[in-house]
Swiss-Prot record:
The keyword Plastid does not apply. The key enzymatic reactions in nitrogen fixation are catalyzed by the nitrogenase complex, which has 2 components: the iron protein and the molybdenum-iron protein. [4Fe-4S] cluster binds at residues 94, 131. This is Nitrogenase iron protein. The modification ADP-ribosylarginine is found at residue 97. Belongs to the NifH/BchL/ChlL family. Its EC number is 1.18.6.1.
Amino acid sequence: MRKVAIYGKGGIGKSTTTQNTVAGLAEMGKKIMVIGCDPKADSTRLLLGGLQQKTVLDTLREEGEEVELEDIIKDGYRNTRCTESGGPEPGVGCAGRGIITSVNLLEQLGAFDDEWDLDYVFYDVLGDVVCGGFAMPIRDGKAEEIYIVCSGEMMAMYAANNICKGILKYADTGGVRLGGLICNSRNVDNERQMIEELAKKIGTQMIHFVPRNNFVQRAEINRKTVIEYDPTHEQADEYRALAQKINDNKMFVIPKPLEIEELEALLIEFGIAN
């Protein structure tokens, strides 16, 4: 079973990219579990046809310790197993702590047991690695390969570099490795070349360049992944290509994060800071 975590700046399109990629893998016949590690609980919505499923933390609050696996896992597109960790009430408690509670509960209830015959577990993790709780999939060895969703925008690249610092910190203890950068295009000038160069400097690869296409939003409005909404669309093939590249990937590295000056020099070189 491969344990994958998707990180990236808030709003970069992590959940959309994760769900569309998972749909591509499911189409290949892979058995997958998706764990949403975001208080917004929107990491599985497209796989479930828009169903806002009850989160692990909400279920725990309402039912106490009497929680069964079927209470917190729903079957989505092509039998993907979907669960959302959820978060505390706004202004109360720690969302990162909630992720730890949720994943530990899933383990206790046997969500990852051999009987499920899983090929992949995907963790869709909120935003930047800003606290220990959100770093938990990296830190505790829950995830073994990380993909960072980014774009040619400065803050997305800054966040990607920060996440690499988190991976570096826990690479020895958790055994986690970086599998590559996924460029979710924002149509920035020289974007593909810039992210390829960033990947090279960090010591990794740009595993796929996902072109910007408004059809993704159209599929989302219809509460579906692109592959489910229109399997013949060119954007569906982009996500299939990304899924295939992740499935075939053999390049797993300990990243070499850049200094902020190096990052700014890269932005200047490709004309974005001019």
